[in-house]
Amino acid sequence: MHKNKILVPLSNNSYEVIIKQGLINNIGEELIRIGINSNRKILIVSNKEISTLFGRKLLNNLKKNNFNAEIFNIKAGESHKNFASLSEIFNAAFEVGLDRNSLLIALGGGIVGDVTGFAAATWLRGIEYIQIPTTLLSMVDSSVGGKTAVNHPKGKNLIGAFYQPKAVFIDPETLITLPTREFKAGMAEVIKYGVIKDKSLFEYLENEKNRDKILNLENESLIKIINKSIKTKACIVSEDEKENGIRAILNYGHSFGHVIENLCGYGEYLHGEAISIGMKIAGDIATEKNLWSKEHSLRQDHLIESYGLPIQTPKIKKNDVMKILMGDKKVRNGKMRFILPIELGEVDIFNDINESQFLKYFN
């Protein structure tokens, strides 16, 4: 099977994203190829479910290539993306004796990847880590770009660091075991790339035959949307690694989405489901401000719904919405900034949105 290779070009610490069917069986060989010697200790961080599915396979391959590796599982779910899980990883790192020459591997979805990345950024002031994402959302979004974090009771991803992985290894075969709801949630991030930067991807996703292939996990279609999504993200991240400018457009739908995740209770809505509703709200505001046409807004809404994702805003107290938004990482000098579409495949950053223009979408 052909191996897709995407470079994330940065001023320091550029790295590869490798996409290949069956790659989970060859991670040891890939580590050696990128210069990681087998004398380095490895701690694989996963959760019980993912570890049961893929952990033993990965561990056996690493040991076949003479790596000294062990697996440690954290609890699954957004509610465990916290300091407790981070501390558990630190305890495991201490027990197995990870030093500055050691390696962490994140095997799992976005939560495992974010927490493991933050552990790598802070253990002994920084050790290398590898991302092996096993969900669509983590493949196309969170595993690439170096954002690592844990949640705080006051908000999502408030404590973290920009810390790039040594490499990202993606095996689309791992999606076969992914629950349908989680796969569809991952499609929200793919749709996002179509709206913010890649009109051709948006149109590809609109095609009914393509949609059926994607939802039926047809390999060629999966690799195509993963490839296009990561290329878009790599292009943006290479231009603005630490989100001082254009990288903020990757947060399209996320300000409102994070409000929904937080106020409805983490886990009530999956991240991608909340982002879908956030994109719907952003699209409606853009239409109201004559930034893009009603037709484009309706096309976006239809595309979101066609992949089984929600667009209906849940009932939330308006006062609570403002508290969460003012704690958003995109706030600058006390002003909220919103990513709004101005065309299919193009968005911009606005800080002149009145409260009344978005609070009305929350009951």
UniProtKB/Swiss-Prot annotation:
Belongs to the sugar phosphate cyclases superfamily. Dehydroquinate synthase family. This is 3-dehydroquinate synthase. PANTHER family: 3-DEHYDROQUINATE SYNTHASE, 3-DEHYDROQUINATE SYNTHASE, CHLOROPLASTIC. SUPFAM superfamilies: Dehydroquinate synthase-like. Keywords: Amino-acid biosynthesis, Aromatic amino acid biosynthesis, Cobalt, Cytoplasm, Lyase, Metal-binding, NAD, Nucleotide-binding, Zinc. InterPro entries: Dehydroquinate_synthase, DHQ_synth_AroB, DHQ_synth_fam, DHQS/DOIS_N, DHQS_C. Binds 1 divalent metal cation per subunit. Can use either Co(2+) or Zn(2+). The gene is aroB. It is found in: Cytoplasm. It catalyses: 7-phospho-2-dehydro-3-deoxy-D-arabino-heptonate = 3-dehydroquinate + phosphate. Zn(2+) binds at residues 189, 254, 271. Its EC number is 4.2.3.4. Pathway: Metabolic intermediate biosynthesis; chorismate biosynthesis; chorismate from D-erythrose 4-phosphate and phosphoenolpyruvate: step 2/7. It comes from Prochlorococcus marinus subsp. pastoris (strain CCMP1986 / NIES-2087 / MED4).
